[in-house]
A protein has these predicted regions:
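Structural motif
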Residues: 70-71, 85
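Thr-Gly-centered strand-to-loop micro-motif
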Residues: 57, 75-76, 98, 110
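Aromatic- and Lys/Arg-enriched surface recognition patch
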Residues: 93-124
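Short, positionally conserved secondary-structure boundary motifs
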Residues: 1-63, 83, 94-95, 102, ...
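Short beta->alpha connector loops
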Residues: 79-80, 114
Length: 145
């Protein structure tokens, strides 16, 4: 897992065009009132910079949660992990992204049936939650890198 710090050469003040009109994912509709505003992507996905970090995903254990190899996850350490949260966990000092299930028996659940759940004792020191995934960034178009 690749750790990417939030602080970078970017100031976080850059904005990109944002068209506030909702776009249908079903049948197309006439373009009505496409108003352009500006959106600061950093302020949208990073609400608490001091407790936020980015990770790049590798592997396919979370594909049914639409988290794919190469995606970037935005993780907030200050968010309280709850039943059903997608979390970053350390198991015996190895990191993974999984869904946290607390009932009926605590486990880290992969979102791919090819992988088994990872059951654990909540009082165990071998499992530590390192944060809750708040956003994921997926690249859709092929772009030259």
């Amino acid at each position: 897992m690749l750790l990417i710090p939030v602080k970078s050469a970017a100031t976080g003040n850059e904005t990109i065009p944002f068209f506030g009109e909702l776009i249908p994912a079903g049948f197309p509709s006439p373009a009505a009132g496409w108003e352009e505003a500006e959106l600061n992507l950093h302020s949208l996905v990073v609400s608490r910079p001091a407790s936020t970090y980015f990770l790049r995903v590798t592997g396919d254990s979370m594909q049914d949660a639409r988290i794919h190899s190469g995606d970037v996850l935005i993780v907030d350490r200050s968010e309280k992990p709850e039943h059903g949260s997608i979390v970053i966990a350390s198991i015996d000092n190895e990191f993974t992204v999984k869904q946290l299930l607390l009932r009926p028996r605590p486990c880290l659940m992969p979102m791919n049936p090819a992988y088994p759940p990872i059951y654990f004792d909540p009082d165990s020191e071998t499992v530590e939650i390192w944060g809750v995934v708040t956003f994921s960034l997926m690249k859709h178009a092929k772009c030259s890198e």
